[in-house]
């Protein structure tokens, strides 16, 4: 019975999910994104250093910030190499919690 319920919930979640999209923004951390920049925290000499320091030392999470919204990312490993840089993130957005189920992250031009 539990497996049937789990299968139903998984199907309902997948069918409610939006299709894959590409989002453009900067990889930063949720602490600095909440303050709309690194000026307040400034944990390094660059935005990339600040982002990585906030994640490593302060328990922050990598996010994609598009200038208005900070999207949580399901992948918390790949973003480190793009910290402080403009990227294209492809994935499926969960509208309720603003989390992108990441398929790929590529540098944007």
Q: Where are the regions a protein language model picked out?
A:
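Bacterial Sec-dependent N-terminal signal peptides
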Residues: 2-3
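Hydrophobic h-region of N-terminal signal peptides that target proteins for export
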Residues: 6-17
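Conserved RNA-binding domains used in RNP assembly and mRNA/RNA metabolism
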Residues: 16-109
């Amino acid at each position: 019975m539990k497996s049937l319920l789990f299968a139903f919930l998984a199907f309902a979640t997948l069918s409610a999910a939006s299709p894959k999209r590409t989002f453009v923004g900067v990889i930063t951390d949720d602490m600095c994104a909440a303050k709309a920049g690194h000026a307040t925290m400034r944990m390094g000499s660059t935005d990339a250093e600040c982002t990585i320091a906030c994640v490593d030392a302060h328990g922050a999470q990598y996010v994609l910030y598009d200038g208005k919204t900070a999207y949580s990312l399901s992948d918390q490993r790949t973003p480190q190499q793009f910290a402080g840089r403009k990227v294209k993130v492809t994935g499926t957005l969960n509208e309720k919690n603003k989390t992108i189920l990441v398929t790929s992250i590529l540098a944007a031009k």
